[in-house]
């Protein structure tokens, strides 16, 4: 009977912990994007959802892209990350490595394991620049719209980055709206809207995703090493694209 009571108490404690409420206005911690059934193998580094039609400009850019793996894989792939160019945002968010949110007085820092990148999200009330010089990770501002929902708006992204590994393009005038709603202590519901009239005929509403807290995790130094990428491409990726049209991803 005593053993049964102990087990029952532990089970109830675990359940209570899982249902712990979200702290107010706090995203701090290491988070991992959860898998989604709706995401195909080819789309694992993309926003997913219903991809809108490309404009003529967008289609021309898309046709120039040569992915390193997937259905469109071909020898001579020109995915920028194959030579260790920055992955860019939002693609890095969908890469299967965690990231950490840290909050300081006038910014939220989003620190990614991939390339050990730090993204700054300003929370001091400033407006986005109207005509910014493009950057790999753009310019971002954020605000709390209620006690559990943080909204980020951003623009000024370098158009050399791709929206996923299959080569979907974007322009320098792309604007993003991200919503991070912390629904309980361990869970964030994430939504993304991409607005880029130069590349797409209507806004791209990304597939809603879930982020889970990883309380014991630490962000490692996951740098892209050019010599390792080149060796992997020569030994595995290029032969895979040539033989099957589906070069493996590293």
Model-derived regions: residue spans:
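PEST-like low-complexity, intrinsically disordered acidic/proline/serine-rich tracts
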Residues: 18-250
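Positively charged n-region of N-terminal signal peptides that target proteins for export
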Residues: 1-4
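N-terminal signal peptide c-region/cleavage motif recognized by signal peptidases
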Residues: 13-15
């Amino acid at each position: 009977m005593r053993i049964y009571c102990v087990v029952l108490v532990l089970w109830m404690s675990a359940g209570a912990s899982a249902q712990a409420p979200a702290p107010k206005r706090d995203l701090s911690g290491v988070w991992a994007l959860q898998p989604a059934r709706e995401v195909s193998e080819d789309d694992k580094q993309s926003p997913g959802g219903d991809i809108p039609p490309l404009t003529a400009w967008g289609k021309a850019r898309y046709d120039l892209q040569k992915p390193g793996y997937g259905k469109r894989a071909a020898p001579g792939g020109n995915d920028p990350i194959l030579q260790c160019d920055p992955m860019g945002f939002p693609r890095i968010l969908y890469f299967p490595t965690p990231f950490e949110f840290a909050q300081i007085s006038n910014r939220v820092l989003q620190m990614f394991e991939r390339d050990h990148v730090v993204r700054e999200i300003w929370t001091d009330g400033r407006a986005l620049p109207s005509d910014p010089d493009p950057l790999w990770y753009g310019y971002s501002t954020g605000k709390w719209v209620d006690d559990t929902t943080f909204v980020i708006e951003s623009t000024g992204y370098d158009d050399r980055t791709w929206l996923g590994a299959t080569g979907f393009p974007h322009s320098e005038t792309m604007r993003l709206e991200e919503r991070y709603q912390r629904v309980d202590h361990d869970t964030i519901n994430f939504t993304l809207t991409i607005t880029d009239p130069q590349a797409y005929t209507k806004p791209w509403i990304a597939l809603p995703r879930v982020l889970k807290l990883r309380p014991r995790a630490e962000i490692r130094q996951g740098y892209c090493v050019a010599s390792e990428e080149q060796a992997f491409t020569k030994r595995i990726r290029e032969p895979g694209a040539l033989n099957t049209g589906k070069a493996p991803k590293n």
